[in-house]
Amino acid sequence: MNILDRIIETKRTEVLQLKLTGVERIDREALKPSIKQRLAGADLSVIAEIKRASPSKGAIALDVDVVAQAKQYETSGATVISVLTDETYFKGSMDDLAAVAAAVDIPVLCKDFMIDRIQIDRAKVHGARLILLIVAALEQEMLADLYAYAYAEGLEVLVEVHDEEELRRAEAIGAQIIGIN
């Protein structure tokens, strides 16, 4: 079992727990500007990332002040701030996402391993303007469903691909923002 398989298995357990406890509702002001609008006509666009740890690198910045880091990214001209919210493998949290979203005026990406609609609901109530869908982690039907659901909920989607076959899958669902990893 590779790391992506282990992460997805952990996410299945987390989703079951989320469905039992539900997603808290947080009143949010209007959504941040559209990422597509921010990318249009830009010579250079930067997605700056807040990442406490990773499975491959271990601890990176466990004690990072996410608000200070996000404000520094915004001041430096970042187009989007990506916040890792996976707790088990990346040591992030929804609290990190909410704190960053409340502190900046640019779009915030919830970077997690989305496998269920309830995770999209949770990202939205914590201030995400866009979410990440990883083609390699999803069957085509679920990829299409989560993509459509996120847009129906007023969010944008960054679809991550690793090769040409995944790019074709992303194009098949009409992905408007595609990232190559």
Residue ranges of model-derived segments:
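Short acidic catalytic loops
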Residues: 107, 112-114, 120, 131
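A short alpha/beta connector and helix-capping loop motif
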Residues: 119-137, 143
